[in-house]
């Protein structure tokens, strides 16, 4: 089997025991299956939930806390317990683990984003297994936004993974809720995530997790857009992840032939950057960018809105107000207002700092 880079996401419901805590049996089962992937020569990254589940009982909560401060306190205690449990299990297979705790803001800051990319790359080069969780004790997003589903999609894109496996307590996607409808039809393969498929998923999560099927479908759509194929399902035993790669997984495969992967810098611009202003361009410039893949030149700029610095990300819109993309600007807003609409030779004649492009095509993404 060809060596692949695999991101596996394990949710709280796939780790929990009957009391809502972490099941050692479940965790051991997952680790054994992850070790088999490594044994087959694949590179593996693990996105794991479960910090709250691992920590709430140690703080005296009778069940998973419902308040934000309770969840974050439980996560602060549980993260070290969860990591300790993983480390001890992986040690049995001679696998070195590494912990990364991320927040959504780490993705929006380009320097942190680049550092995460470099760190993960070095860990994989050293045959370590990165274990990634959202920093639950200080981050609100993981506790209210998808049980790490979207984090797993973003990480899979960041590392140019071949496949994202989202493991949960439901064996795939259905056209109806299978727990309430006996005639529910299971989707074994979906070439893409359509609006119809997205509308079928409810928001409700399981009792022990925060991510329902909707968050998993959203994550699958994001991963597919980044060139990563997806599996959503369940399974038990040492071969369950290897079986997914063989097409025998108990769930739904999403995505047809792999799409072209998106470079790290363009991923950051498309998904994580903060827009600092807007640039309006004429029809000729819009055609050159969209249809011919050209860079944006000062001559095509008709208006500048906002206050931004060199290197900030701006939206680009047509004169009819339609946003067509965004990119990193090589001029500040003040500089661009001075030279908008001017030909390159006229800018040079002014004797001012001159870049041929306002936005280079390597730092541009279409929307």
Swiss-Prot record:
It is found in: Cytoplasm. ATP binds at residues 9, 168-169, 210-216. GO terms for cellular component: cytosol. Catalyzes the transfer of a phosphate group to glutamate to form L-glutamate 5-phosphate. It catalyses: L-glutamate + ATP = L-glutamyl 5-phosphate + ADP. This is Glutamate 5-kinase. Residues 276-350 form the PUA domain. GO terms for biological process: L-proline biosynthetic process. Its EC number is 2.7.2.11. Pathway: Amino-acid biosynthesis; L-proline biosynthesis; L-glutamate 5-semialdehyde from L-glutamate: step 1/2. Belongs to the glutamate 5-kinase family. Substrate binds at residues 49, 136, 148. InterPro entries: AceGlu_kinase-like_sf, Asp/Glu/Uridylate_kinase, G5K_ProB, Glu/AcGlu_kinase, Glu_5kinase, Glu_5kinase/COase_Synthase, Glutamate_5-kinase_CS, PUA. Keywords: Amino-acid biosynthesis, ATP-binding, Cytoplasm, Kinase, Nucleotide-binding, Proline biosynthesis, Transferase. One of its GO terms (molecular function) is ATP binding. Pfam families: AA_kinase, PUA. Transmembrane segments: none annotated. The keyword tRNA-binding does not apply.
């Amino acid at each position: 089997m060809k060596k692949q880079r695999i991101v596996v996401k394990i949710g709280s419901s796939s780790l929990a025991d009957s009391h809502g805590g972490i099941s050692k049996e479940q965790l051991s089962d997952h680790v054994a299956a992850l070790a088999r992937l490594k044994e087959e020569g694949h590179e593996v990254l693990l996105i794991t939930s479960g910090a709250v589940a691992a920590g709430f009982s140690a703080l005296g909560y009778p069940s998973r806390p419902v308040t934000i401060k309770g969840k974050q306190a439980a996560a602060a205690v549980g993260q070290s317990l969860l990591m300790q449990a993983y480390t001890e299990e992986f040690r049995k297979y001679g696998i070195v683990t590494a912990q990364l705790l991320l927040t959504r803001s780490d993705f929006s800051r380009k320097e942190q984003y680049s550092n995460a990319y470099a760190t993960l790359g070095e860990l994989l080069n050293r045959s370590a297994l990165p274990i990634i969780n959202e920093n639950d004790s200080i981050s609100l997003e993981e506790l209210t936004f998808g049980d790490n589903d979207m984090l797993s999609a973003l990480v899979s894109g960041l590392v140019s993974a071949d496949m994202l496996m989202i493991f949960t307590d439901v064996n795939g996607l259905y056209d109806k809720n299978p727990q309430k409808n006996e005639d529910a039809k299971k989707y074994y393969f979906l070439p893409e995530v359509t609006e119809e498929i997205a509308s079928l998923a409810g928001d409700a999560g399981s009792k022990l997790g925060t991510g329902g099927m909707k968050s998993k479908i959203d994550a699958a759509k994001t991963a597919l857009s980044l060139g990563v194929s997806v599996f959503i399902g369940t399974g038990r035993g040492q071969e369950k992840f290897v079986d997914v790669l063989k097409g025998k997984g108990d769930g739904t495969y999403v995505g047809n032939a792999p799409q072209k992967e998106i470079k790290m810098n363009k991923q950051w611009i498309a998904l994580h950057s903060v827009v600092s202003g807007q640039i309006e361009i004429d029809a000729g410039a819009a055609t050159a960018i969209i249809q011919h893949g050209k860079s944006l030149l000062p001559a095509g700029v008709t208006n500048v809105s906002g206050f931004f610095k060199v290197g900030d990300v701006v939206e680009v819109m047509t004169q009819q107000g339609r946003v067509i993309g965004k990119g990193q600007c090589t001029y500040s807003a003040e500089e661009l207002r001075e030279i908008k609409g001017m030909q390159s030779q006229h800018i040079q004649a002014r004797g001012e700092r001159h870049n041929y492009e306002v936005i280079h095509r390597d730092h541009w993404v279409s929307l």
